[in-house]
Each structure stands twice: as structure tokens, then as C-alpha cells.
């Protein structure tokens, strides 16, 4: 019934198995991939023909994690998986980026990749395995795909590169880098690092590229026995159209791309485009080409002319040379009632970034396959349509916004203080108000400024820069701080963020083969110079974190209590801690290890809560004077509540220095009194005295103290 084919190899000390022919047989391509004991199913379906009028390649990648894979049941009312999590969105992008350039130009059939995690061994992250499974499924599917693609994770532990480290090993690694590519080219890099230099980062990329070569061999081996017949796809030949269009519009397009202002340049390009359309799509008579074909070739021609201009003149669209960064203006504190704020402007790209400090109860709970954990640093990136002068959809963030936010998050996180150094939850929101290239790197710079403005003790300021690379034969040009127009014209787009001393995040997308290690080294070196320049410009606004928090930020005091006292502080059903919060106004968060965080914008509220908690967990000291409240009177004395919830007896003989006939003659219920702890009787009951304390001042009376000592 099943025509099953399997290939198995040893990869980084664990078995990797690729199987096809048994599951999801109606998909164009389906591969069940197992690494260790983590299992994913990757499927590919591509329509047999493009939709009419389709002018782009509609590729969709959906990565989904099923909770049953880790033996769990989803939370929530419906008890089933809902909208994609942040990780599912990020891994979908991770799979998409290296495969998209390998579909032939002109292929516009609707194509969907679905990757499902169906088993997780809690040791091997399914993201790299999903990339491998997708590549294998595409290679087998018969869909035109110039693969296969391999992928690997690289760690850097104790000065050594580690291929596909286990999840628990990543805690010790100063690098988390995922690389993907073909036999002879690196296509994609995504990473977070702890201030590593350019040589170490490039070495990790090449180490990972070498490390996934056996995976490519395994995919080819499987394809030799299980691949479907390749679909007959021949891209249309538009060389005649391109040649004619070049003759018609080259001069005007070259002039248009000499205009440095974005709006004016766009207007000039639109005028050339209108002329081209009028020529090739006449209102009268039959047109030789469709509007989609003319539009696509015009776009292709734009890219060619910009590339030629840059390689020939070493001058950019906006008049800069290859290495110049656009003018930068940095401002902090522009929103004084927020906890920290910054406005970062680089050319026509601008971000308002606001930092907010919160308490432990503001941490985000993340329910992943590996277990529930709390995230104390949140970074949200918003890209409204007005930032590029357009109208568009508003609402929940799209994949691009989530991906850009995570890139900035990775860049900043290595420089954050530990929870012990700074016990706050941090949320940063980046509002992109203008965009003409590299808004994600503007977010990195703005986040660094806003956090320093908020008084968050960053280890060092962080900046980011977006780079491009154009390669034609043996000529190449590396572009620093690319514009939006330059973003899609290059052969390599990469974003580098870090401090003056090293890289904290690197994202790279390479679209062609032929980019050597040496070219990448030159590009990273140029990026380092640009990053240092940007840090210098940022330092004009603020050089280090402010010594104190903003006026409106909450204050947090940390204290530690014995673990066995946590129950007493919380109380039955949370009764005690609720009372403390209600009476003092402070927010209180108690960790399982006995760490207590007390937060409020008022120092008095924090101190009141601290004293209350201290009175619950500490033991009263014999000989000390405490303030208390009379809670009950009796013939033989008064019961006084002191030191938190403790009660003790002031015997009638200890109420006053003179003889007392009736307790109520001295105190009544509700009276505030000062008492001294004399000790404990044979049954452990608390013995208190009022007569040895001056009830007006709370100070001990010297003569009474001597009498008491003599009596003892």
C-alpha cells in the first residue's frame, strides 16, 4: 500500500532520518523528518497554473507546533491551538527566506508549505529540522525549485563552535546562529550573540555551511529514488521587450535616479513609467504585451539601472558614496511623563521609541512546547502605513512587524542588566513614523536611547545598520545604510547590530551564488565602521544610562524571606498579601525562592509594605520596644497586637508603675500603645510590659528598666 523511501545519516552526533511515501501522499511533496526524537512533517502543494493577472509569487509558509508533540493540552477555554505564536511566526519566516530566492523568476503559481511539529524530545529545536524537511519536500515535489537547501544551528561555547547544540547547551553559548544555504552558497543567517567580533561571526557562518553539507547529500539521495517528474516550466523570454524598453527609457530613468529627494524621485520614475505604459499599452489597437508583463520588466529595468549607476559611478540614489551614513538626529526625553523616550531620525527613516518599566506581574507568560517561562523584556515594533505615505491595513501586527521587532530584541537583549541588578519588567514600543530603509535598525538605535533615558543600566549602547551588496562579474559594491529603493536591488541584504566592541545580532539574506567568504568579510568590516559612526552620533544625545529612574517610573525594592515563610506572607487564599497591597498601595511579587519585589512610585508605600512583610517573617527580639494595638481587655490584663500579626499579654501588673485595680482604667480596645517584649512563659506565650515604656515617646523609662532587671 505504501511506497516508502527512507534516508538516514548521523549528523552532529544524532540520527537524522528523512522519510517519504507513507504520510500526506496527496501533497505534491511530503517528508517526515526525525532528528533525535523530534519529528516534523513538511508538505508542499503548488497550483498547476497561476491565477489570471498574478504579478507576484504567492508563496506561503505555515509552521505550526502541536501541543501534543510535547505531551501537553492547550490552555484556554477551547483547549485547542489558536492563532500562531510568536515563535511559529518567526520560524515560518526562517523557512521562507532561504527557499524563496530558489524558485525561478516568473513562477507565479500559488504555493503553500505547511510544517507541523508532531513530536518534540525537548532536546532538539524543531526549527532547523523544519528547514531541512521543507527543502526535502520541495526537492521531491516536482515543483520548479533550484535546491536543495540545508540548514544548521551554530553555538559558540568556551571558544569553540558547536554544531546543532542541544537546547540545554544553548544556556552556555555566547552565540545562537542559524544558517541556511546550498552546496556552494550561504543564503540566510539569523543570529544573536554576546558581543562577538566579525571574524568569529563569519567563522560561525562558514562552520555552519560546512556542517549542513551531509544533509544536502541525504536530500539528493532521497530525491534519486523518490522525486516526482519535474513540472514543465519555461520562463517567458522578455529580452526583446526589455531591449526595446531600455532604448525608450534608459536616459530618463538614469536622470530620475539622480534625484536625491524620495518624493521627487518617485514622481520622476512614475512619469517614466507612464510614458512606457503609453508606448507598450496603447489605448487603441491591440497591445503586444500585458500590463503585468510591462510592469514586471519595468521593475526589472529599474533595478538594472540603479545597479549600473552604483557600480559605474560609486554614487548612490541619494548622492551618497558607498560608505556614507545618512544624517542622524537623536533626541531623548521628548515624552517626559513616560518612563523613557527617544526620537531617532536617520535620513528619511524615523522612529519614536518609548520604554516602560513594570513589575514582576507585568512579565509575559510564554507557553511553549518546552514548558512555561516568563519573559521580562518585550519589544514591539509598529509600522503604520502613513510612515511611507500610503493608506493601508491597521490592526494586529503582521509577520514582518513581528520579525523586525524580534531582530531588534535580539540586538538589545545581550546588553540588558540581570534581574538581580535591575528587577524590572521592560517593555519597549517602536513607532515607525517615517520609513525609507532600515526601520528595524532605527528601532535598535531608538531602543538603546530610550532605555538609557529610562535609567535602565545597559552594559553598553547598541546601534544597528542595514547594508547591501551588488555583485556583477568580478565587480562588487558594498552599500552602507541602504535606502528602501536599494533594499530589493542588491544581491545581499544584511543587518548588523552591536556595540563598539562586538556584534549582538546579525541577519543576512543572500540572493545569488558567487558571494565569497572574502566579500562577506569586506562587507562586515564596512558595517563595523558604520555602526561605530552611528554610536558616535547617538552619544550626542546621551552617552550612558541615567543615574536615576524617571519621575513617573515605579520604584522596586527587593527583599528575601525564608521559603517556609512564603505561606504566611500570602495567607489563606491570598488574604494576607491582599490586605498588605490594599492598605499600603504597593504592588508585591513573591518568587518561589523567597525573593520579594515591592513596587510603587511612593517610597512611603514601599517602606510600609516592607515593614509589614518583615514583621510577618521575622521573630520579635526580647528586650525590644514595639508599637501595638490593644485588641482585647480582661480582668488579668490586656492583649496587644504587635509586630505584625502577633499578639501578647500585658499582665495587669505590667500596665502601669502604680497599682492598677481595673484593666479598663488604663487601656481600652483599639488604643495604640508601646510595649516591651519581656520574654515567653513556659507555654511559649508572649509576655509584654507597658510600664517600662514612656507611652508618649516610645522610649524605655530608665528607672523602670533597672527595677525590671533587678526583678529578673
Curated annotation (Swiss-Prot):
Catalysed transformations (reactions): RNA(n+1) + phosphate = RNA(n) + a ribonucleoside 5'-diphosphate
InterPro entries: ExoRNase_PH_dom1, ExoRNase_PH_dom2, ExoRNase_PH_dom2_sf, KH_dom, KH_dom_type_1, KH_dom_type_1_sf, NA-bd_OB-fold, PNPase
Alphabetical UniProt keywords: Cytoplasm, Magnesium, Metal-binding, Nucleotidyltransferase, RNA-binding, Transferase
Entry's localization field: Cytoplasm
Domain S1 motif: 623-691
Residue span, KH domain: 554-613
Binding site for Mg(2+): 487, 493
Primary subcellular site in the record, as a coarse category: cytoplasm
Top-level class of the enzyme under EC nomenclature: transferase
GO BP terms: mRNA catabolic process; RNA processing
Residue ranges of coiled coil: none
Highest taxon, organism lineage: Bacteria
One Pfam family per UniProt: S1
Name listed for the protein in its UniProt record: Polyribonucleotide nucleotidyltransferase
Amino acid at each position: 500500500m505504501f511506497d516508502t523511501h527512507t534516508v538516514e545519516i548521523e549528523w552532529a552526533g544524532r540520527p537524522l532520518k528523512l522519510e517519504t511515501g507513507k504520510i500526506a501522499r496527496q501533497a505534491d511533496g511530503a517528508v517526515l523528518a526525525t532528528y533525535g526524537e523530534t519529528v516534523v512533517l513538511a508538505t508542499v502543494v503548488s497550483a498547476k497554473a497561476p491565477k489570471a493577472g498574478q504579478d507576484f509569487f504567492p508563496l506561503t509558509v505555515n509552521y505550526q507546533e502541536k501541543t501534543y508533540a510535547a505531551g501537553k493540552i492547550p490552555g484556554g477555554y477551547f483547549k485547542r491551538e489558536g492563532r500562531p505564536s510568536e515563535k511559529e511566526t518567526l520560524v515560518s519566516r526562517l523557512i521562507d527566506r532561504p527557499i524563496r530566492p530558489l524558485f525561478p523568476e516568473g513562477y507565479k503559481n500559488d504555493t503553500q508549505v505547511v510544517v507541523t511539529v508532531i513530536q518534540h524530545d525537548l532536546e532538539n529545536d524543531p526549527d532547523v529540522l523544519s528547514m531541512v524537511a521543507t527543502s526535502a519536500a520541495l526537492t521531491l515535489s516536482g515543483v520548479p525549485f533550484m535546491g536543495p537547501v540545508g540548514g544548521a544551528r551554530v553555538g559558540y561555547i568556551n571558544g569553540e563552535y558547536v554544531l546543532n547544540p542541544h537546547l540545554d547547551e544553548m544556556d552556555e553559548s555566547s552565540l545562537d546562529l542559524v544558517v541556511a544555504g546550498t552546496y556552494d552558497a550561504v543564503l540566510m543567517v539569523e543570529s544573536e550573540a554576546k558581543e562577538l567580533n566579525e571574524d568569529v561571526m563569519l567563522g560561525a557562518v562558514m562552520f555552519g555551511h560546512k556542517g549542513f553539507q551531509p544533509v544536502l547529500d541525504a536530500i539528493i539521495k532521497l530525491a534519486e529514488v523518490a522525486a516526482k517528474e519535474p513540472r514543465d516550466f519555461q520562463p517567458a523570454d522578455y529580452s526583446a521587450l526589455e531591449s526595446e524598453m531600455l532604448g525608450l527609457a534608459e536616459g530618463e530613468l538614469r536622470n530620475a535616479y539622480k534625484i536625491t529627494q524620495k518624493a521627487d524621485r518617485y514622481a520622476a520614475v512614475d512619469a517614466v513609467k507612464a510614458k512606457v505604459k503609453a508606448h507598450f499599452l496603447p489605448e487603441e489597437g491591440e497591445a503586444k504585451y500585458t500590463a503585468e508583463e510591462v510592469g514586471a520588466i519595468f521593475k526589472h529595468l529599474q533595478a538594472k539601472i540603479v545597479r549600473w549607476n552604483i557600480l559605474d559611478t560609486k554614487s548612490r540614489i541619494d548622492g551618497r558614496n558607498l560608505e556614507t551614513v545618512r544624517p542622524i538626529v537623536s533626541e531623548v526625553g521628548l515624552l517626559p511623563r513616560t518612563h523613557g523616550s527617544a526620537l531617532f531620525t536617520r535620513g528619511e527613516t524615523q522612529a519614536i521609541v518609548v520604554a516602560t518599566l513594570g513589575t514582576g506581574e507585568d512579565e509575559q507568560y510564554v507557553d511553549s512546547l518546552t514548558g512555561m517561562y516568563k519573559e521580562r523584556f518585550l519589544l514591539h515594533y509598529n509600522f503604520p502605513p502613513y510612515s511611507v505615505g500610503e493608506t493601508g491595513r491597521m490592526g494586529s501586527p503582521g509577520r514582518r512587524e513581528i520579525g523586525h521587532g524580534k531582530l531588534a530584541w535580539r540586538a538589545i537583549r545581550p546588553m540588558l542588566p540581570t534581574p538581580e541588578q535591575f528587577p524590572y519588567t521592560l517593555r519597549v514600543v517602536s513607532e515607525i513614523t517615517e520609513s525609507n530603509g532600515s526601520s528595524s535598525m532605527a528601532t535598535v538605535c531608538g531602543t538603546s536611547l530610550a532605555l538609557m533615558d529610562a535609567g535602565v543600566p545597559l552594559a553598553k549602547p547598541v546601534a544597528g545598520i542595514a547594508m547591501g551588496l551588488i555583485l556583477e562579474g568580478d565587480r562588487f559594491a558594498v552599500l552602507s545604510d541602504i535606502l528602501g529603493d536599494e533594499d530589493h536591488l542588491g544581491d545581499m541584504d544584511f543587518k548588523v547590530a552591536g556595540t563598539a566592541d562586538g556584534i549582538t545580532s546579525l541577519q543576512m539574506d543572500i540572493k545569488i551564488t558567487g558571494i565569497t567568504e572574502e566579500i562577506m568579510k569586506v562587507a562586515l568590516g564596512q558595517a563595523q565602521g558604520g555602526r561605530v559612526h552611528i554610536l558616535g552620533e547617538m552619544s550626542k544625545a546621551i552617552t550612558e544610562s541615567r543615574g536615576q529612574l524617571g519621575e513617573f517610573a515605579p520604584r522596586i525594592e527587593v527583599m528575601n524571606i525564608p521559603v517556609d515563610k512564603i505561606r504566611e506572607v500570602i495567607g489563606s487564599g491570598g488574604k494576607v498579601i491582599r490586605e498588605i497591597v490594599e492598605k499600603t498601595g504597593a504592588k508585591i511579587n513573591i518568587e518561589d525562592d523567597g525573593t520579594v519585589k515591592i513596587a510603587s512610585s511612593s517610597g512611603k508605600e514601599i517602606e510600609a509594605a516592607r515593614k509589614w512583610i518583615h514583621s510577618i517573617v521575622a521573630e520579635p527580639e526580647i528586650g525590644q520596644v514595639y508599637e501595638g494595638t490593644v485588641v482585647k481587655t480582661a480582668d488579668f490584663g490586656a492583649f496587644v497586637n504587635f509586630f505584625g500579626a502577633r499578639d501578647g499579654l500585658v499582665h495587669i501588673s505590667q500596665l502601669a508603675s502604680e497599682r492598677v485595680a481595673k484593666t479598663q482604667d488604663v487601656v481600652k480596645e483599639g488604643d495604640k500603645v508601646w510595649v516591651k517584649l519581656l520574654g515567653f512563659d513556659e507555654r511559649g506565650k508572649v509576655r509584654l510590659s507597658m510600664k517600662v515604656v514612656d507611652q508618649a515617646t516610645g522610649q524605655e523609662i530608665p528607672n523602670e528598666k533597672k527595677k525590671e532587671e533587678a526583678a529578673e
